[in-house]
Each structure stands twice: as structure tokens, then as C-alpha cells.
Amino acid sequence: MADEQFPAAATALEEYQSIEEQMASPEVVSNPDKLRKLGRRHAELGAIVGAYKAWLQVKDDLAAAQEMAGEDADFAEEAKRLEDELPGVEEKLRTALIPRDPDDARDTIMEIKAGTGGEEAALFAGDLLRMYTRYAEKRGWSVNVQSENTTELGGVKDVQIAIRAKGTPAPEDGVWASMKYEGGVHRVQRIPVTESQGRIQTSAAGVIVFPEADEDDDEIEIDPKDLKIDIFMSSGPGGQSVNTTYSAVRMTHLPTGITVNMQDEKSQIQNRAAALRVLKSRLLAMKHEQEAAEAADMRHSQVRSLDRSERIRTYNFPENRIVDHRTNYKAYNLDAVLDGDLQAVIDSDIQADEADRLANQK
């Protein structure tokens, strides 16, 4: 029987059908949080179910064609075609059954920090912010700036953004599925605008990414007693006050020392809620990173993407060249990449990760 050969796929189909029934119930329809969680799991199972149904169809058609092959030459020809098609369909199903990163469908919190290089590093951090914003626009995602410290020349000392998809995307289309590869040190080589002798300078910016926790995420629980909350006045570029109320929030998680600053919402209550969500996201990322390290499983590429010290990419302006050091991807369209044409670079990381996961399954 089919489910004896691929029991995991048969189980996925049963769960998929059960979720569809739940999502149609009035109780779930009236509960957005429950509906979102079920929708995410439904999308996660979709690739497996689609591949499984395709495999079942080919198997059934092949059996029927073989049964009639002795009586009709057309059926014999059809049976031969289906025999040739079956291995490819089966391989697609085996690939779909390889566990994905469970966070792929989640949205993403990203921090960009200017590194070595002074004002030039801050200007480059601003370039990265623009690049990711343009890329998100091309993908139909929204970008919300949660906190930002800028320089007098328009550079970015540090910025935190939330990148979010619309609705409930399939895991492969989720924000985290693509943006998790962006964590690390990004190096730039170019002639600074302040360089009078035309010398190329190397500077860097660090990017930190982690999947965004849901507001009601029960995977992470925070005891209010573990929080220290400071309230202060929001500030803009150069320390200028952007409002006259103390609405900015600094939230510190005492057990881990993680600190989150939030000032871009309109009220203290909104900044508290936003800070708590970012804190939960950080703790969720830490939890998953620890689990991956302990289990030494297929999520190693995600852990690598969270490594803040790894130089992952070089942006060479004089040669209009971009290099991803993890995959050896190289192209001479840096201007287009910085304008948001980033997909080919990210695809090289996705393909390398998929190859690793396939190798680890064998």
C-alpha cells in the first residue's frame, strides 16, 4: 500500500485534511490567532501533500495502464511513459519529506549596525537598509522601522526593522526562508565621499536576523518578574526630541541580559507591546539556536546565518562586484543588487542549504 512506502506522507495528508476541517469551523474562523497558526501549518504541509498526491496518481495510472497493456498497444506505451516518470515524482516526494526549518514561514526582525569604518560604515549600513527595503517591496512584503539611530551625513549607526509577508505564505515563500541567510558581516570596498585622494577604503556593517515571534506565541513564556522596563523620551537624529512625552521603552530580560529599545510607535503602550514581541523573537531565536547546537541537526545553516562574526559578503564598488563567500557566488551587478535585485544571491544560499539537507538525509 502507498502509505506503507511513505507513512510520513500519509500522516501529513491526514493532518492536512484535519486542519482544513478545523479552519472551516466557526470557532476557528472567529479566532485570528488560532486561524493564523493553523494556516501556517497548513501551508507547511502543502508541499508534502502535493507531492504525495502526484505520486499516488502516477502509481494508480501506472497500475491501470499495466493491467491493460496486454490488450492495447496504446496502454503499453502509456505504461512505459509512466514507468519513466515515476522515479522523478518519487524523488520530489522524498525531497518534500525532508524536514524544513520550522520557522521558514515566519516574519523576520533584522538589525543593521555600522561596524569598522566610521562615517563610511554608517553610510554603507544605510545602503543595506535601502537594499533590503527595496528587496522586500519586490517580494510584496512590508518593512516597519522599529528603531533607528542616524548620523549627520545621513548614515545609519544602527537600525531595527520588521519585515512581514501578507497573509500566511507557504514556508518556501516566508520572509525567514530567505532573510535568514543575511545574518553576518557585510564588507564594502569603495572610495568614500570624504576621500580626497581617491583611495579605496574597506569598512563593514553587521546584520543580525531572527524569526519574529507571534504575539501569542506559547513556545516562549516570559515571567513579568524577569523584566526591567525603563521609560525615556524618544529621540531623532543627533539626539533631537521627536515628541514631548516619555513614550520610548527600554526592556531588559534579566536572566539573559537581552535589551530591546523601542521608540517609533505612537504611545508608550504600543512601544511596550512592540518591545515585548521583539524580545520574544530574540528568545525564540536563542532557543532554536541552542536546540540546533545540541542536536547537531540539519538546521546548521540557520545557526550559521545567525553568526554575527562571520564575513558573508563583499560589496566592491570600483568593480561593481558582489561576492557571497559561503557559496562563492559572484556577479558584476552590484548597482542592481543594492537597488533590491537580491534574489539571485539569496538563491545561491538556498540551493547550498538544500544540497546540505539532502546530503544529510542520505
Swiss-Prot record:
N5-methylglutamine carried by residues: 240
This protein's UniProt keywords: Cytoplasm, Methylation, Protein biosynthesis
UniProt main location, coarse: cytoplasm
PTM remark: Methylated by PrmC. Methylation increases the termination efficiency of RF1.
SMART domains according to UniProt: PCRF
Entry keyword annotation includes Protein biosynthesis: yes
InterPro entries: PCRF (IPR005139), Pep_chain_release_fac_I (IPR000352), Pep_chain_release_fac_I_sf (IPR045853), Prokaryotic/Mito_RF (IPR050057), RF-1 (IPR004373)
Stated name of the protein: Peptide chain release factor 1
Provenance organism: Bifidobacterium longum (strain NCC 2705)
